[in-house]
Structure formats: structure tokens, C-alpha cells
Amino acid sequence: MILYEYPFNERIRTLLRLEDLFERFTFFLTQEDAREHHVALTTLFEISEVAGRADLKSDLMKELERQRQTLAPFRGNPGIEQNALEAVLGEIEQTLSGLSQMQGKTGQHLADNEWLASIRSRAIIPGGTCKFDLPSYYAWQQLHPDQRRQDIAKWVTPLLPLRDAATIVLRLARESGQASKVMAMQGSYQQMLSGRSYQLMQVRVAPELRVIPEASANKYMLWVRFTVQDGDLRPRAVDVDVPFQLTLCSL
């Protein structure tokens, strides 16, 4: 099944963006070629932009503290797997500690590094990081891959508590939902939300159907409409029934 996810609010939207960026960053950082490490570095700049939102750190700390207070009373409950509970609580407490130790504006260490700042300013220009534009960057790219990885790992380290916090919050949200099998009649589906507050919607479709869900929602109702791509890859509305799995997630 192909999984599509749709955030219901700006906070979850930001966390999904962070998750996607960190996954891309990790993939390219583990490679060997200097061009792949260039992608890792420019992705680090994107992470800094997204993570630099003024209230992100405080939002994550509040949510993790809320989850800690919700889960802690289950200690000693015979109906709860205690090892799993302690693992989650330990992860939350460790991440809260990491967030509390973050000092200053998020990503400021990258802005204060003049060499990185010069690369960042050139990277937004098409072809702006050629060897004649940034000879010192080109020289760095000639270093051994392990040295480049070590440098990039040092630059990303101050941002890792945000990654860890986003991972926990998204995992708890995803684990809260239960998938149900539904049918989009003539490619369209809608459902009343009965006043319940959700943070995330997941849509799973069989890959052989080759359909693409487009979703929207408000606090009363959600809509899912399926399209297919024509020869020019433009979306075209589906007019047949489409089976899919729907999961609504709430923290």
C-alpha cells in the first residue's frame, strides 16, 4: 500500500516537513560522493529554516510534557506493558532534557559561521556554488568522505533534539489511529468528524490502482478526491469507485 499523509494543522505540517528533511539529510550524509554531501549540506540549511520558527521548540516541549503527564499515571497498571511504557517515558524525558539545553535562536550557529553563511547565500543561486565561486568550498569537497561527514554531523548536532521531539510526537499521533476500509464512490469520499479534533489523516491505496488522493478538511468534515495522471502527468478526476484505507490520528 502507498501511504499519503495530510496534516490538519500548522504544527503537524511543520513536523512532517522536518521529518522529510531529516530523512533526506540522513540519506545523503551516509553516501560517499561530494555532490551527495552537497545535497546533505543544503538540506541542513532547509532544516534550519523550518526549525527556526519562533515557537517550534516551546510547542514541542509543551506537547511532550503533556504526553508525559498523560502516560505517567499508567505506571504500575497491570493492563499496560510496563517495559514499553518506561521506554516511551524515558525517551520523552531524555528528549525534553535535550530541548531544554538548546540555547539561543535555533540554527544561529549556522548563521554565525561565515564560511557556511557564504555557501548558504550562494546555494540559492542556480549554479552558484561552482568551484570558481567558492574555491574554499571546492577544497572542502576534496576531503575524505569521513572528514566531510564529521563536519556536517557537527553542524547538525545542535538541531537533533528537535528531530527527536518531532519523531516522538509524530509516532504517538500515528499510533493513535486505527485504519478502516472505505470506498470513494466515483472517486470521491467525505466523512463527518462529529466535532472530534484530529491532527493527521492517513490514506493508503493499492499501488496497482495508480490513483492519487487529494484531501481537505475542516473541524466538521473531511473530503478525499482521487485523481489519475494522464500522459503529461496532469491530474484528471477519477469517475470509478476507489477502495482505500483511512486512518484519523489524534494526540
Curated annotation (Swiss-Prot):
Q: Name one GO biological process term.
A: division septum assembly
Q: Where in the cell is it found?
A: Cytoplasm
Q: Does RNA-binding count among this protein's keywords?
A: no
Q: Which residues cross the membrane?
A: none
> What domain of life is recorded for the organism?
Bacteria
This protein's UniProt keywords: Cell cycle, Cell division, Cytoplasm, Septation
Q: Name one GO cellular component term.
A: cell division site
User: Pfam families in the record, alphabetically?
Assistant: ZapD
* Matching SUPFAM superfamilies: YacF-like (SSF160950)
> Is Cytoplasm there in the keyword field?
yes
Q: What binding partners and quaternary form does the record give?
A: Interacts with FtsZ.
What this chain does, per the entry, is described as: Cell division factor that enhances FtsZ-ring assembly. Directly interacts with FtsZ and promotes bundling of FtsZ protofilaments, with a reduction in FtsZ GTPase activity.
| NCBIfam families cross-referenced by the UniProt entry | PRK05287.1-4
Q: Which family does it belong to?
A: Belongs to the ZapD family.
Q: What is this protein called?
A: Cell division protein ZapD
